[in-house]
Structure formats: C-alpha cells, structure tokens
C-alpha cells in the first residue's frame, strides 16, 4: 500500500531533506565542538595536592628557574645548576631519613663534572664537557652493590628507568616550557618516588642534562657516566612550543607506549612519530640519543604550540600556566610509575647494536588519544593484519553480494531497461543515473580547496601564522557549499535513487586504494601515520554493503517491468503512461496522431485537451513528497508516494531509515580521528613557515584534511536544504576576503627574526644581521636606528633572507657594562696558537691549534678546506658516537667546523688536526687556513650586547627576536698553518 504524504513528512528518520540536514549537522557539531574544546582547554589543576606532589611548590620553582636566560654559555646557567642541586638536596633530605635505614629510599645524587665526549656528524665535529645532574633512586629489585664505582662493572637485574629533561635554555628565551616544565616535573618525580610508600620496583634515574639546545650535547655526554648502564627504558620531557598540552611526540614500541596509557589526560597521535621517521620534522630532541645511539626504549613527551613563542622571551611563566605544568607532570608521574613498577621481562634482550644496553626489541606501535581522556595502543602488526583482511574481504563481499543480486534479478545498478512481453518493448530502469557524480563532485570540491591553498600561498602566505581558524573556516565553507551546489544541480537535472549507493561505492574504491598505500608503508617502513584510513575504509565498506543489501528489498526487475506494463495495458493509453515504456520494434513508428480522430482529439497535433487526459504540473514540497495542483491524472494516480521526487519508480520499496545507520558507520569515527589529527597537525605546522618551511604545505594539508573530514557527507548532501550551505557561502566570502588582505602577525602571534652579531677581531669590522622571511625582515630592519642610512645587504640564506649592516654598537661581553675596568682590546678576546707538526705515519699534513676566549665557555674552529681527522686533548672516545669522518656517517668529505664547549670559563682547548694533501702544491705550501672563533651568549645584563638591546627595543611589536646560532655574538680571528 502506498504511504500517505502526511506520514512521510512526519517521519523523523526518513531520507528526506529536513531530517538529513538536521541529523548530519548535529552529528558534526556535537563531535567537532568537544574536539576543539579538548584541544584548547586544559584539565584543571587538583584543588588539593596529590600525595607525594606539591603543585604550589612546583609552580614557584618554575618561576624561580625562569627568572633569566640560562643557556649553557652563561653565568646564569651556573646559578641555575647550583639552585637545582640545592633543591634536590632539600627534597631528598626531607623525604629520605637515612639511606642506611629500612624505611628510607636509597638515593644517590651525582654532580657530574668529569664526563666529556667528541662527536662527528654531518661534517661537524663537537667536543663537549658535561655538567649534568643525575639522581638515582634505587629500586627494590636493583643490584644492592654500588657497582658504578668499579670501572667496567655493570648492574644486574632487569634494568631501570630514565626520566630526562634539560635545564639549559636558549640565549633569547626564559625556557619555561623549553624545558622548565620538564625540569620541574623531574624535581617532583624525585619528591614523589622518595616519599615513603612510593619506592620504585625498578631503579629510577632522573637526569637533568645541560647543553641540549646546541646539538643535544648533554644527553650524549650522559652516555659516558657509569649510571647510564642501568636504564633500559626512558621518558624524555621536552618543549617544542610554549604551553598548551604536552603531547606524546613519538615512542619506540608498543610495550613501552602502553605505560603512557595510564596518563589521566593522554594526548597525541602516531602521526607525529611518522613525521620524524619521514624527515618532515627536522628538529630533534634528546629522544634520538637515548633511543638511537644508546639503544633504550622509550617515549618523547613534549609541548608543541604555540611555535611563535618558542625560543623567545615569551617562553616564560607568564605565558604558560599551572594547567600546562599539571598536564605534563600528571603524565610523567603516571607513566614513570608504570615503568618502575613493571616486573616483566619485556625490556630485556639482545642489545640493538654494539655498546648499546640489552633492552631487547619491541614491536612497532599505533597510538592515538580520544578526546584527551582515552588512549588507544596496539601493534602495527595488528593494523597490518586488519588492513590486509579488509583489503580482501571488502571487495569480495561486495562482489558476492552483486552476484546474488544479479541471480535474483534485483541488480538495478547499471541497468538500462528491462524487456517485457506482449509487444510493449522494454521498461527503462535508469540504473546508470548518478554513477559519474562522485568523480565530478569530489574532484571539483577538492580542486576548489586546493586552488584556495595555492591562492593563499601566492597572495598572503603567512596568514595561517595567526589566523589558522580563518583558513579552516574558508576551506570548510568552500568545500561544503561546492559539494552541496553540485549535488543539488545533479539531482535536479537527473534525479536518481542510486545517488547514495554509487557515491558510497566510489568512496569505498578510493579508501581501498588509500588503504593499499598505507598498508605498504606499514609493512615496508613501519610507518603507521595512516591508521585512520582503516577506520575510514571499514566504515565506508559497511555503509556500501548496506546499500547493496537494500537492493534485496526491491522487486525483481522483471516483476517491476510486468507490473508497469500491466498498469498501462489495463487503462486507457495516455501520453504520460506511455513514457514509462520504451517502444518495442513493432510499435516503432506508431504515434498518437496516427489514431482515428475523435471529439476529444486536440486541434493541435499530438496534444490532447480533454479533462480526462489533462496533464498537470507536479511540485516538490521540500520534504520529498509530491504535491499535485489540480485534478488527478493517470500518471499521478499511478505515482507511489514512497518514491522521492522524480527518482526511479522502482525505488518505492527502498528502506527510508538505513541512511542513518550508514552515516553513523562512516562519519563519527572519521570526524573524531580526522578532527583531532587536523588540529594537532595545524598546531604543529601553522607557525613553522617563519622558520623557512614551505608556505604551501600547511594550506594543502588543511585542504586535504577538509576533504577527508567532510567526504562522509557526499552520499547524503544532495538532500540538504539550502539554509546551511547558503550561510556557509557567506562565511566563505568573508573569510576569503579576510585571509587575502589581513596582516598575518600580531603581538600575540609574532614572527621570529634571528639575530647574530659578528665581529672581526683582526680588523674591528662589526656586522649585525637579522634573518627571516621577506618582506617582513626588511620592514623590521628599516625600524632599527643604527641601520638607518647604512648599506643594507639582504641575501638568501637557506629558506630565508639574511639582512645585515655595519654597526657602531660594539658588544661589551668581556667586561660588564658600567664596569670600571678598561675595555679589553678586540684582538685579546680570542687567543690562539697554530703550530705545524711533524708528518705522521699516515698523513704528512698535521697541525696543533690551541684556542681560548675571554669570559666564554664556547669556541669553534672553522676550516676553509675540510680536515680528515682531529682529536681534542682529554676527550673521551665512544664507538657509539663517531669521533672522526667516516663513510657510514656521510662525513667522508671531512670536517669543516669543530665546536668546543668547556665547563670552565676561559678554558684553553688543544686540537690536533690532519688534512689531505693538495696534489697541485708541495707539502710546504699545503697550508690550512680558517678562523678561530669564540661565542658569547649571555644577554641577561642590559647593555652587554647593545645591538641586541636596540633590535628588541625598536622592532615592531609583531616581531620576536631569537638567536640564529649558538652564540649571539661571534668574534673571529683568521689563522694559517
């Protein structure tokens, strides 16, 4: 029986325009809103302290730690180190009554002033003397001997846990989140695990390393301390942003990642881990030393936004929060507690290389959070197995279902017509209608947002720096409006009940191809960044299969054809009724006008005018029901109200509610995974363009994520009413205009310019440079008084532009400004002595260079041609860290620069160097030339570096000044030997 028109309009679950518009919109809003809230609103700090922790104390410690710049090469760094040793002593002495007593936790503090190391990497040599602070809290199952006191002795047992943070900052940042919060979290971990009742089962090593900011030196030199043999797992606490949530950057394996699952507020995605593996993220953390060089298995937890404050004077306590501190601290406590309580043998086994700890090998991990409260972790092998299964089962299931439908004569897809008996010809099915819609609509919508990405990169490439949500709004509104507009046009021109099944079939094909690609990466490279594709493909497969199963509810094609032919033969012939049939061969050439005229025949040929055969217009009421205007005709009487609009008549029996199930299978999980991933990626990259990264990539990523996020609407969007798309069109126009004309920076979203002052100590030449993105770096230089009237030289430097000028502002880095001491002559800032040595057994070109600098702990030697070998007197050598050029490390061309770091001020380094002979000259003329340079990085005293003070004072408020190199000031002298 035909459904009544009123019943159809009152069904809130039917596949009509109002239910589809309301339901789809509500699902998107209901899921995207909490995703955005979770991303930006941090968990509240507990009203009362957690046992073993003191959050008020932690916040006060952070404020004290960040009261000045404290890079390795600064006197403030020494003050911070002394303060940390004092705080650790206070914590340990308060919690540990006596290490000899039963009720005390055995704790040892190592003030490491002995470890040093030489490392060569990427044609750069580094010699570093460490000043790390190491706290060892003994575990219940640890070796009771003080084995570290005996050279060559190793600990017994299952291995311990390392928690690391670095206490040095950059020379232009206070280091609140890079890495102050990590350091304070370590202090609280010491407090927590030395509190009675919290004694660890495995030993806990807390490392506060010094010298991370320049080449990860502190972590590398930690490897030389005997206690480094104990830990098999680690947790690295880092800051690559300046606040917000601490995210799980990367992990070594599934087994160790499961302990992060204990965090009360987990946050992160394996996508970031893939970014490091694929080289998309160029900067590194101490994680690479512990996991790659030493063979530990662990986690990298770090702040990642906002990048505009990273390494600037806004990385301070004022611009972070207690909520950020609590977010990292709570994760650190939960994760560490799980690791030190583990009694399994999961982290024992063969070392991953010579000299590495015997931590065994774990399985690749897939992990992501859900709304910042739940955390999914499983093996990449599981993802691979599920992917392969879906790749096989999905197409096979649809193929078998299609065969069954064809055998039952219910395969309406691709059907053109069905022949009927009695000479009526064939009944059209119009089964191809809607087949080509998805490629056209999907291609057009995707092309539109990709075109917008290129437009932004061309006209206003930096707008995403401060207005990332305006870019998102523009992309989303454009995509949805174009998709709706094209779908409505297609549905108006050629209405089809097969729109949904065809679109879903195309979507399944697309996700199947994407799943093939991600499966290859999972198996070949261990990269799981496409984890969301399997959820996408599975939901799309299930929704597509439901559409195929819906076809079983339709009559057989032959029955439908016979029914149509029977209806037509049982009533007077009409023009409207005849259109349901395709003429047979016998009826070709027969026309109504060939019949015998009667009194009802129209005076105009081919047109009947009697009331009995009057054809009326039929209108759509907007809910899918058809309203007649006039007296019923043969056609309208035969029309089934279960048929939506002018779609195929045979679609009357299709279920009206299954679309909801299909949408719920596809959309929610896609919205959650893609929505969270989109915000995570946007936060990580939208402010990286100032560092010289591609200006196009962020916009392309947002465009593609928009496509993935809203593609689940394509099977249903042709049922949308015009209200929301029209509103989105207005949003698109407004955001497009804004994104094209708005200035991309502000006081809260500053662009970074990189400062360096270079002084030629031989000639007295003094040059200041700012490096950044054009035209903004030139605009900033124009505001500097000392640059006014100077010859500004702007040259490309990597992916940025360096603008430099001669400056009259001489740095006062040897004596404090206002000191009564006389200024030290420039040529005494750096002292060196280069002596040629007797030819060796393997090389005739050998020299010894001694270098020292006043009031500095960092110098370097730059060679005009590469050296093939060098050695710093007193340096340790470790096979895990190459100390000379080698083919395996890509440094076979030699070393061009050696950086020298000392824990003492004014130290003299002695470097022996060898270089290859030049075939064009004899040995006596084969000289080695270069520069002896020292670095000064202490900007805590006003007037010490007047050029820096001036740049900070007079730069526009949308500019942040940060350091370009290891030193803010570089003083150089030329040498030849």
UniProtKB/Swiss-Prot annotation:
Which EC class is the enzyme in?
hydrolase
Q: Where is this region: Disordered?
A: 566-604
Annotated transmembrane regions: 18-38, 384-404, 439-459, 470-490, 501-521, 526-546, 660-680, 697-717, 727-747
According to its UniProt record, where is this protein mainly located? Answer: membrane
**What membrane topology does the UniProt entry give?**
Multi-pass membrane protein
**Protein location:** Vacuole membrane
> Which residues are annotated as active site?
212
Q: How is the cofactor bound?
A: Binds 2 Zn(2+) ions per subunit.
- What GO cellular component entries does it have? vacuolar membrane
Assigned protein family: Belongs to the peptidase M28 family.
Describe its function.
May be involved in vacuolar sorting and osmoregulation.
Q: What is this protein called?
A: Vacuolar membrane protease
> Whose protein is this, by species?
Talaromyces marneffei (strain ATCC 18224 / CBS 334.59 / QM 7333)
């Amino acid at each position: 029986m035909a459904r009544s028109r009123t019943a159809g309009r009152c069904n809130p679950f039917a596949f009509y325009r109002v239910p589809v518009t309301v339901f789809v919109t509500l699902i998107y809003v209901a899921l995207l809103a909490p995703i955005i809230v979770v991303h930006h609103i941090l968990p509240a700090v507990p009203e009362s302290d957690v046992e073993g922790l003191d959050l008020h104390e932690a916040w006060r410690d952070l404020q004290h730690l960040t009261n000045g710049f404290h890079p390795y090469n600064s006197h403030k760094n020494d003050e911070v180190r002394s303060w940390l040793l004092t705080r650790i002593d206070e914590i340990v002495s308060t919690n540990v009554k006596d290490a000899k007593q039963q009720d005390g936790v055995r704790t040892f503090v190592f003030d490491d002033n002995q470890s040093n190391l030489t490392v060569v990497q990427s044609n750069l040599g580094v010699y570093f003397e460490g000043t790390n602070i190491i706290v060892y809290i003994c575990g219940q199952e640890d070796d009771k001997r003080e084995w570290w006191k005996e050279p060559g002795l190793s600990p017994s047992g299952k291995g311990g846990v390392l928690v690391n943070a670095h206490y040095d900052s950059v020379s232009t940042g206070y280091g609140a989140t890079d890495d102050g919060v990590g350091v304070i979290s370590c202090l609280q971990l010491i407090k927590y695990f030395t509190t009675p009742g919290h004694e660890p089962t495995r030993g806990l090593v807390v490392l506060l390393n010094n010298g991370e900011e320049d080449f990860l030196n502190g972590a590398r030199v930690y490897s030389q301390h005997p206690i480094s043999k104990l830990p098999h797992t680690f947790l690295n606490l880092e800051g690559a942003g300046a606040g917000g949530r601490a995210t799980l950057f990367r992990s070594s394996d599934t087994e160790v990642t499961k302990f992060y699952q204990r965090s009360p507020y987990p946050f992160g995605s394996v996508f970031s881990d893939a970014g490091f593996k694929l080289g998309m993220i160029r900067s590194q953390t101490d994680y690479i030393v512990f996991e790659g060089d030493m063979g530990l298995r662990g986690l990298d937890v770090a702040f990642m936004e906002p990048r505009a404050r990273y390494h600037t004077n806004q990385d301070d306590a004022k611009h972070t929060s207690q909520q950020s501190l609590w977010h990292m601290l709570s994760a650190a406590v939960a994760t560490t507690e799980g690791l030190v309580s583990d009694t399994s043998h999961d982290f024992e086994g063969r070392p991953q290389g010579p000299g590495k700890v015997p931590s065994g090998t774990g399985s690749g991990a897939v992990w992501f959070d859900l709304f910042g409260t739940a955390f999914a972790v499983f093996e990449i092998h599981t993802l691979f197995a599920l992917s392969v299964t879906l790749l096989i089962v999905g197409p096979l299931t649809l193929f078998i279902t299609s065969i069954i439908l064809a055998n039952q004569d219910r395969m309406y897809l691709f059907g053109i017509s069905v022949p009927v008996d009695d000479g009526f010809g064939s009944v059209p099915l119009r089964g191809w209608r809607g087949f080509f819609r998805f490629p056209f609509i999907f291609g057009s919508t995707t092309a539109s947002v990709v075109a917008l990405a290129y437009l932004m990169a061309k006209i206003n490439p930096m707008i995403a720096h401060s207005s990332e949500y305006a870019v998102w709004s523009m992309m989303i509104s454009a995509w949805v409006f174009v998709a709706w507009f094209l779908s409505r046009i297609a549905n108006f021109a050629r209405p089809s009940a097969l729109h949904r099944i065809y679109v879903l079939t195309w979507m399944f094909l697309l996700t199947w191809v994407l799943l093939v690609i991600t499966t290859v990466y999972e198996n070949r490279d261990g990269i799981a960044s496409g984890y969301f594709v399997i959820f996408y493909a599975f939901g799309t497969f299930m929704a597509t299969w439901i559409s195929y199963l819906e076809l079983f509810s339709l009559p057989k094609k032959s029955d439908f054809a016979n029914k149509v032919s029977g209806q037509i033969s049982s009533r007077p012939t009409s023009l409207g009724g005849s259109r349901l049939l395709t003429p047979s061969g016998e009826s070709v050439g027969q026309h109504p006008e060939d019949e015998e005229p009667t009194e009802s025949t129209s005076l105009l040929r081919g047109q009947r005018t009697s009331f009995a055969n009057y054809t009326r217009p039929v209108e759509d009421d907007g809910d899918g029901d058809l309203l007649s205007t006039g007296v019923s005709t043969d056609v309208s009487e035969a029309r089934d109200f279960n048929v939506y609009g002018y779609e195929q008549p045979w679609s009357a029996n299709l279920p009206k509610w299954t679309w909801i199930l299909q949408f719920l299978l596809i959309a929610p999980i896609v919205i959650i995974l893609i929505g969270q991933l989109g915000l995570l990626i946007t936060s990580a990259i939208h402010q990286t363009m100032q560092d010289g990264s591609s200006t196009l990539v962020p916009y392309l990523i947002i465009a593609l994520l928009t496509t993935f996020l809203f593609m689940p609407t394509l099977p249903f969007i042709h049922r949308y009413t015009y209200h929301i798309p029209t509103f989105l069109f207005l949003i698109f126009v407004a955001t497009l205009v804004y994104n094209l004309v708005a200035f991309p920076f502000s006081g809260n979203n500053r662009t970074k310019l990189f400062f360096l002052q270079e002084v030629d100590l031989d000639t007295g030449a003094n040059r200041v440079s700012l490096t950044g993105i054009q035209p903004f770096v030139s605009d900033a230089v124009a505001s500097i008084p000392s640059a006014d009237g100077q010859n500004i030289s702007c040259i490309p430097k990597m992916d940025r532009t360096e603008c430099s000028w001669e400056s009259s502002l001489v740095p006062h880095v040897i004596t404090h400004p206002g000191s009564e001491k006389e200024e030290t002559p420039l040529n005494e800032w750096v002292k060196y002595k280069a002596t040629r040595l007797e030819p060796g057994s393997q090389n005739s070109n050998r020299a010894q260079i001694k270098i020292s600098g006043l009031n500095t702990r960092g110098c370097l030697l730059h060679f005009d041609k590469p050296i093939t070998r060098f050695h710093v007197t007193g340096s340790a050598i470790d096979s895990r860290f190459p100390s000379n050029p080698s083919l395996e490390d890509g440094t076979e061309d030699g070393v061009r620069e050696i950086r020298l770091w000392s824990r003492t001020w004014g130290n003299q380094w002695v470097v022996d160097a060898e270089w290859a002979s030049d075939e064009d000259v004899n040995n006596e003329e084969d000289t080695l030339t270069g520069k002896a340079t020292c670095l000064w990085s202490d900007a805590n005293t006003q007037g010490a570096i007047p050029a820096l003070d001036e740049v900070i004072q007079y730069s526009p408020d949308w500019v942040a000044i940060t350091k370009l190199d290891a030193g803010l000031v570089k003083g150089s002298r030329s040498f030849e030997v």
